[in-house]
Design a protein with these regions (language model features):
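Short acidic linear motifs
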Residues: 1-176
Length: 176
């Protein structure tokens, strides 16, 4: 609502807080915490993306730094699998692990889960990277009154380096 009423600064803060809440919800919990937390974080980040055009240079820089820290706090899929395994062991004992093995017809019942969580983790990290690039591009636009040609144009003044895509490892390009 803030964004539609012309208060993009407040909308960006609220959207960042929603993303922060989502990331905090993923910390140390089992699979359901990770799924709900990443969905909430994704929602906040998508809203933040819509608010970038109305931000100042200072606000863009501040959000870039906050996003760097927030992305680093996100639990890895391995940590989530460890928490899920511990939760099953605590609630169902060894029997729970055997049931998971039986249901999945495998000796590695958590492997499919780890693969799905890795995809979700990479997707969310890609959004974090896109946002940092968009914020750097907005700073570039405001300071130089030009559109950046590529991500390389933003390095080193606006980004530390060209950020790789979390899934492919190839350098990210300017989001459209």
């Amino acid at each position: 609502i803030e964004r539609f009423e012309g208060h993009t600064n407040e909308a960006a803060v609220i959207a960042f807080d929603a993303a922060k809440l989502g990331v905090r919800a993923t910390e140390g919990g089992p699979m359901i915490d990770f799924l709900v937390g990443t969905a909430a974080a994704q929602n906040g980040l998508d809203t933040l993306k819509l608010s970038i055009a109305g931000l100042t240079v200072h606000q863009c820089r501040e959000l870039q730094l906050k996003l760097d820290g927030l992305a680093a706090e996100l639990d890895t899929p391995e940590e989530v699998v460890r928490a899920e395994r511990a939760w099953i062991q605590y609630n169902f004992g060894v029997k729970g692990t055997f049931v998971a093995m039986w249901e999945n017809e495998t000796l590695r019942p958590y492997e499919e889960f780890r693969t799905r969580m890795r995809k979700r983790y990479n997707d969310l990290n890609r959004v974090f990277i896109e946002l940092r690039i968009l914020l750097a591009a907005q700073r570039f636009r405001l300071e130089k009154s030009l559109e950046p040609d590529s991500v390389e144009t933003l390095v080193p003044d606006y980004l530390r380096s060209v950020l790789p895509d979390p899934e492919t490892g190839k350098p990210m390009t300017l989001p459209k």
